[in-house]
């Protein structure tokens, strides 16, 4: 595997210093179940990638053949690697060329290997880090209950949002918009007040426990929580763009949603949403996919029309209200990581 200190692509939409900070973090680029057979194309931080699985190992590399620059995603998969469609060069599990059809038996030049990146397969997702320090790799975000007995693992289809990842994540953390945006899925338009809550800083970002009477049953459902039941929503923010939400239902039922916002560019985000739950295990996963997408779709218009498109980390640039505690903690966390005052505008 060839690894180098990466530099932003020529067409990069990020500030170069912000790009490098993001490149040092883990981001999801595909669902693991989708990496089987033909090479898969993905884009992360404006870098075009090829993803393939060979001999049980997942490879994430720049989507370019080092011979004549053809995208390897135009090629095909064989037992021993992926094959460039131009001259038939084949690249194996370590990213090295292992066949040159036009020169059988000849030494293979050392330059014929892919620029590949660190890979982790977790929570049903393929994660990569474009600038991973092998001696000090960054921690991968964690997801509560994913491996716990009795919990069903669900991985919803990915989808794209035409907006900045930071804006989308901030919306996921926001608890004041439920009664205005999510009334067709789970929220009550008459339940608008936001009780006090206090985010707590952690080594990976922050956590916040939000107690309220806002339920999480589908609006069309006949099920209701017991009278006076208080719902706990436990948020864990893993900077920069991955958050989890654990919702405590009646009778010790739990629903965990990971909101993993993968920055395709500074203006496009690919969303991944693993889910774990210990109830309604008889319900088809397709129904879970559909409901989860409906909730995300309710947020889409807000995220895609916010101005500025980036996330102002200078807190004096926008007004704030008491319900914005998580939003403020998020922006402060990004600022502490070193991102610019006017992040990715």
Residue ranges and their predicted role:
Residues 25-43, 103-115, 183-191, 220-227, ...:
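Short, solvent-exposed secondary-structure boundary motifs
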Residues 23, 113, 120-122, 255, ...:
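A short, structural micro-pattern
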Residues 21, 111, 291, 295:
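Soluble or luminal CAZymes and related metallo-dependent hydrolases
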Residues 18-22, 273-275:
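Short, positively charged
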Residues 2-18, 28-153:
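Rieske [2Fe-2S] iron-sulfur-binding domain
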Residues 134-345:
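C-terminal catalytic domain of Rieske-type non-heme iron oxygenases
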Residues 26-27, 40, 49, 117, ...:
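A broad, low-specificity signal marking well-ordered, structured residues that form hydrophobic/aromatic
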């Amino acid at each position: 595997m060839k690894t180098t200190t990466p530099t932003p692509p020529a067409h990069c939409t990020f500030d170069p210093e912000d790009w490098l900070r993001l490149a040092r973090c883990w981001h999801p680029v595909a669902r693991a179940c989708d990496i089987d057979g033909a090479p898969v194309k993905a884009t992360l931080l404006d870098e075009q990638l090829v993803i393939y699985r060979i001999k049980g190992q997942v490879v994430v590399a720049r989507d370019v053949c080092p011979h004549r620059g053809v995208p390897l995603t135009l090629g095909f998969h064989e037992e021993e690697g992926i094959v460039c469609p131009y001259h038939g060069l084949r690249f194996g599990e370590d990213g090295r060329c292992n066949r040159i059809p036009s020169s059988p038996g000849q030494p293979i030049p050392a330059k014929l290997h892919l620029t590949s990146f660190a890979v982790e397969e977790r929570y049903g997702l393929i994660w990569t880090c474009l600038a991973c320090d092998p001696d000090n790799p960054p921690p991968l975000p964690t997801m509560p209950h994913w491996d716990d007995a009795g919990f069903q693992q669900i991985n919803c289809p990915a989808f794209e949002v035409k907006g900045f990842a930071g804006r989308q994540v901030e919306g996921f953390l926001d608890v004041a918009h439920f009664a205005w945006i999510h009334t067709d899925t789970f929220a009550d338009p008459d339940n608008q007040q936001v009780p006090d809550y206090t985010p707590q800083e952690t080594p990976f970002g922050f956590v916040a426990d939000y107690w309220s009477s806002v339920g999480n049953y589908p609006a069309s459902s006949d099920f209701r929580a017991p009278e006076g039941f208080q719902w706990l929503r436990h948020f864990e923010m893993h900077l920069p763009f991955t958050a989890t939400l654990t919702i405590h239902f009646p009778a010790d039922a739990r629903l965990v949603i990971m909101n993993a916002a993968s920055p395709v560019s500074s203006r496009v985000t690919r969303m991944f949403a693993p889910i774990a739950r210990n109830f309604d295990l008889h319900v088809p996963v397709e129904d879970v996919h559909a409901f989860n997408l409906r909730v995300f779709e309710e947020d889409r218009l807000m995220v895609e029309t916010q101005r500025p498109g980036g996330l102002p980390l200078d807190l004096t640039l926008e007004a704030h209200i008491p319900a914005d505690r998580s939003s403020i903690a998020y922006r402060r966390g990004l600022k502490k990581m070193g991102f610019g005052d006017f992040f990715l505008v």
